[in-house]
């Protein structure tokens, strides 16, 4: 028989700034640039008109609440990329250490005390020390945003849930290369996280910091 305290657990929890981290997944020049914009106009439009404005608002709100903001970028640790996962080698993901492609988009650039984690796998928990950092900081809730919804965002949501965090996904702060892919991914991992809009989370931040 299930314990009473377990049966009462819920994903619908109040916003606690000290225990919450905004995580921006792969919001970098490699993922969105003029060449990608021409090739994938839907993605370009979503990034420009929806995702970047929402991320900017979220970053400002988290900084204002003195809550953690963290970034991941796909970036080799070595010049020749030997440290990459086998899948990244097979997929030809080669983002040189310190390159323009590895840099976070200017519109949502990290603050001087935000953490930026280079990763060489789809799942941030697999190739960085993010779990160690989150535990040290006292984070139990991870707001997952960024690119791509059906790839690295999906990985992060599921892995965070498996590691005992409370993942929150904001569909209007994520994007991928088609609406079908975006919606299918959100539906597939919905059971692993709480889903909110950017406006709902911003309202929760205001309520928590009055």
What are these regions (language model features)?
Residues 18-20, 36-62, 66-74:
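A short alpha/beta connector and helix-capping loop motif
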Residues 27, 74-76, 172:
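Active-site loop/turn elements of alpha/beta-hydrolase fold enzymes
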Residues 21-27:
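N-terminal nucleotide-binding beta1-loop-alpha1 segment
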Residues 36-43, 82-86, 160:
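Surface-exposed, active-site-proximal loop segments in enzymatic domains
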Residues 66-69, 73-92:
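Early exported N-terminus immediately downstream of N-terminal targeting peptides
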Residues 28-34:
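Short acidic, Gly/Ser-rich segments with clustered Asp/Glu that frequently serve as metal-coordination loops
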Residues 1-21, 57-65, 87-210:
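Active-site-adjacent betaalpha module
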């Amino acid at each position: 028989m299930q314990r009473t305290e377990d049966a009462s657990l819920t994903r619908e929890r109040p916003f606690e700034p000290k225990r919450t981290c905004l995580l921006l997944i792969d919001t970098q020049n490699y993922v969105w640039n003029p060449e990608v914009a021409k090739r994938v106009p839907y993605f370009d439009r979503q990034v420009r008109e929806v995702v970047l404005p929402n991320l900017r608002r979220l970053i400002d709100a988290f900084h204002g609440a003195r809550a953690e903001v963290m970034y991941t970028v796909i970036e080799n640790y070595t010049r020749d990329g030997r440290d990459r996962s086998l899948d990244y080698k097979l997929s030809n993901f080669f983002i040189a250490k310190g390159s323009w492609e590895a840099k976070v988009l200017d519109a949502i650039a990290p603050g001087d005390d935000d953490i930026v984690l280079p990763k060489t796998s789809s799942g941030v928990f697999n190739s960085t020390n993010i779990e160690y950092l989150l535990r040290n900081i006292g984070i139990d809730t991870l707001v997952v945003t960024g690119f791509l919804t059906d790839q690295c965002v999906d990985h992060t949501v599921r892995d965070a849930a498996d590691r005992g965090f409370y993942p929150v996904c904001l569909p209007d702060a994520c994007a991928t290369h088609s609406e079908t892919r975006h919606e299918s991914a959100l539906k597939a991992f919905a059971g692993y996280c709480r889903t909110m809009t950017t406006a709902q989370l911003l309202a929760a931040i205001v309520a928590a910091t009055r």
